[in-house]
Amino acid sequence: MEPKTKKQRSLYIPYAGPVLLEFPLLNKGSAFSMEERRNFNLLGLLPEVVETIEEQAERAWIQYQGFKTEIDKHIYLRNIQDTNETLFYRLVNNHLDEMMPVIYTPTVGAACERFSEIYRRSRGVFISYQNRHNMDDILQNVPNHNIKVIVVTDGERILGLGDQGIGGMGIPIGKLSLYTACGGISPAYTLPVVLDVGTNNQQLLNDPLYMGWRNPRIIDDEYYEFVDEFIQAVKQRWPDVLLQFEDFAQKNAMPLLNRYRNEICSFNDDIQGTAAVTVGTLIAASRAAGGQLSEKKIVFLGAGSAGCGIAEMIIAQTQREGLSEEAARQKVFMVDRFGLLTDKMPNLLPFQTKLVQKRENLSDWDTDSDVLSLLDVVRNVKPDILIGVSGQTGLFTEEIIREMHKHCPRPIVMPLSNPTSRVEATPQDIIAWTEGNALVATGSPFNPVVWKDKIYPIAQCNNAFIFPGIGLGVIASGASRITDEMLMSASETLAQYSPLVLNGEGLVLPELKDIQKVSRAIAFAVGKMAQQQGVAVKTSAEALQQAIDDNFWQAEYRDYRRTSI
């Protein structure tokens, strides 16, 4: 459902003069009217011409096109964001296909690596371990009293790039930009946070420009006590906030999620968001082929928290489609750097133990090795779906893809690792190795593949199709928790918008131009499920839709009226 046009009420603000021009949430730049310039002491501080936001956006677009590298474009857009947020979001929404890869993956990876080098202006909250005793004071320093979404990282596992220390702040900033651009959540309601617990990246520790705490990472009890202090301070300051954990290391991601998901409204996008968008993609791909996900055999390369999170959600979906839990688990095979996860493998992590295959059931496999490699698994399982979340480039080799295609006429191959440099195989290679028969979805953006004069569109399995809608649904419904069923409803809704399902051709996921429409639909489904599950107050469907409309922020300037502090 499209948002209804709503009349914007005037905004009463106490700021004036240069202070107002330095306030990104309120600054209009050359779009301040003459009346506003008189009322807010801006006469002479701006050029004479009063411009519209579209005229400003056109100038910014021309300037943007003058930059030759993606990182320079990223820096330019961040500068606009730190100067005039409304213009930033108008510009991004006007050119979302072009700019999403620049403000987020893959370019944000380089921005994180070079964070201290390209730093210009502070955004968000930096909480170092050294300042742990000032946690409440730090959060009180945030001027926004009505924060509704926080994205927090400790910078230890940034995309596939590893430990970036406080450089990881680029991820919460980019993620929240998408909450606004795709999900209509007002930037005034968002807060990026980095927990600076040190870094084990020696290159950063040796870098004279590094702006973080120069200390090895704290671990174990010290680490968990520090995170707990942060959570308790957030609950005290903003008790109804949605907290998203982002890019925490595997050893901490699942324990933190399990510890806090029933204490504060929270989720981990790397685990749950990735799982939701992947399952939505697989539901759509299965339906487009005239079947169900429960009929497919699935092999994973990568058995970390993200891979296992996806696997568990696939199992839940196939149970919804009629499989028993045992039958559902027998169709999912997890491979990591030590081979196929089996019940005979030592030192498994707790979240991996339910995803093992029984070694006794593999006695008839065609292999001479005790370690069952990805090729061994593909050769013996004959999977319909191959998913890569390894963070390592090139592991989907030609031999593996051709072996899969030998037994599956229409394989679904999803190299999901980010950024582009870490992808398990390129779409170009996968299409060629399967004679044009593979359905490919990637974690990073790729251009369409041209093979034998035919164009193959490549869907980006982008979490941005999921988390903005979840955030909007939580805010609109007032949900106190995010349940597994709410995530499943998001996946199902995403699948319903697949052009491949709706039209029999095209992408398996919607186009970016439709992402706000999809986010609104997901918000409604998530809010409705929250009400059904008792984590939100029940209302009518009309009331929920109205709440979504009311909370959907759009990049338009409002009239200002002067008031005193």
Curated annotation (Swiss-Prot):
Gene3D superfamilies in the record: Malic enzyme, N-terminal domain, NAD(P)-binding Rossmann-like Domain
Binding residues for a divalent metal cation: E246, D247, D270
Root EC class: oxidoreductase
Entry keywords, A to Z: Metal-binding, NAD, Oxidoreductase
CDD domains reported in the protein's UniProt record: NAD_bind_1_malic_enz
Cofactor(s), names only, from the UniProt record: Mg(2+); Mn(2+)
Reactions catalysed: (S)-malate + NAD(+) = pyruvate + CO2 + NADH; oxaloacetate + H(+) = pyruvate + CO2
MF (Gene Ontology): malate dehydrogenase (decarboxylating) (NAD+) activity; metal ion binding; NAD binding; oxaloacetate decarboxylase activity
UniProt cross-references to Pfam families, sorted A to Z: malic, Malic_M
Entries under PANTHER family matching the protein: MALIC ENZYME-RELATED, NAD-DEPENDENT MALIC ENZYME, MITOCHONDRIAL
Assembly and oligomerization: Homotetramer.
Protein name in UniProt: NAD-dependent malic enzyme
Source species of the chain: Shigella boydii serotype 18 (strain CDC 3083-94 / BS512)
